[in-house]
A protein has these predicted regions:
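Short, conserved catalytic/metal-binding motifs centered on acidic residues
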Residues: 31, 43, 82, 127, ...
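RNase H-like nuclease fold core
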Residues: 137, 141-229, 235-237
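Short loop/turn motifs at secondary-structure junctions
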Residues: 42, 121, 222-226
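Short, conserved DNA-binding cores of transcription-related domains
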Residues: 1-87
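Extended interfacial segments that mediate partner engagement and assembly in macromolecular machines
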Residues: 72-84, 88-162, 171
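Active-site-proximal structural scaffolding
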Residues: 120, 131, 184, 231-232
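Short acidic (Asp/Glu) and glycine-rich catalytic loops that position anionic groups and cofactors
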Residues: 92, 239-240
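Short, charged, solvent-exposed linker or helix-capping segments at domain edges/interfaces
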Residues: 43-44, 92-95, 202
Length: 240
């Protein structure tokens, strides 16, 4: 299929090409994509390449803003039939590294969410607002990015800062004895380097001194010794 080479170069998303760019009735820029990655025709179950296309489908993954404003992505891709008789998968749709199957965000947008919090020092709420993504999505992206970039052993610090974040409402469930149990606490505690320079150390659900003490106890044996006793005490006392 023909595509706009200049627009594809500018859009720069691996595995796809821009076939058309236009504005819809509301003035939103619409970017139509087609697949260029030949491996997208391989069955994700058995790996065999298909040569029989069943239909075209359109998905609308969200991407980074372009030119300072969001764009509406419409990826026109094919549904293929797997002809391998030993494979239980009948059909599959194309996927590329930046847009896996059933993904609602491009990989680079998800990565930008994590970088904004872990590397950029923005709160989850602020990063979500800036990038147009919901709190849960940014939070998961933050966890994923942190696992990739944070060292296995936490760097030492003399002071820990606590950042309390609230998301949504508490979720409760009723137990057989009529009592209620908290299933999801809306409050989370983030542990950061209060001396500056080392960013986020970790995050736990809850908003109590017990949550702080539990997190400290789970750290490597050598690590809490570097935290000033006076500062650690004030840190725990600061939690209700």
């Amino acid at each position: 299929m023909d595509h706009d080479t200049g627009a594809t170069l500018l859009f720069d998303l691996e595995g796809v090409a821009v076939s058309r760019v236009y504005r819809d009735a509301d003035g939103m820029r619409v970017v139509e994509l087609v697949t260029t990655d030949e491996t997208a025709t391989a069955c994700p179950s058995c790996g065999s390449f298909s040569s029989r296309s069943k239909e075209r489908v359109v998905t609308r993954p969200r991407d980074l803003p372009h030119g300072g404003s969001p764009v509406d992505i419409r990826w026109v891709k094919r549904r293929w039939e797997c002809r391998e008789v030993r494979c239980e998968r009948g059909t599959f749709t194309e996927q590329v590294s930046q847009i896996p199957a059933r993904a609602r965000l491009t990989g680079r947008l998800r990565e930008a969410c994590g970088q904004a919090v872990v590397d950029g020092g923005r709160t989850v709420i602020q990063a979500g607002r800036d990038l147009g993504v919901s709190w849960p999505v940014v939070m998961q992206a933050t966890r994923d990015h942190a696992e990739q970039v944070l060292p296995a052993t936490l760097p030492t610090t003399e002071a820990i800062g606590i950042d309390e974040i609230r998301r949504g409402r508490a979720v409760w469930r009723e137990l057989p004895d009529g009592k209620w149990e908290l299933v999801a606490d809306p409050w989370h505690i983030g542990f950061v380097d209060a001396t500056g320079g080392q960013g986020l150390f970790g995050q736990v659900e809850g908003r109590t001194s017990a949550s702080v003490q539990k997190w400290l106890a789970e750290q490597p044996g050598h690590w809490p010794r570097f935290v000033s006793g006076e500062r650690a005490l004030s840190c725990s006392a600061g939690c209700p």
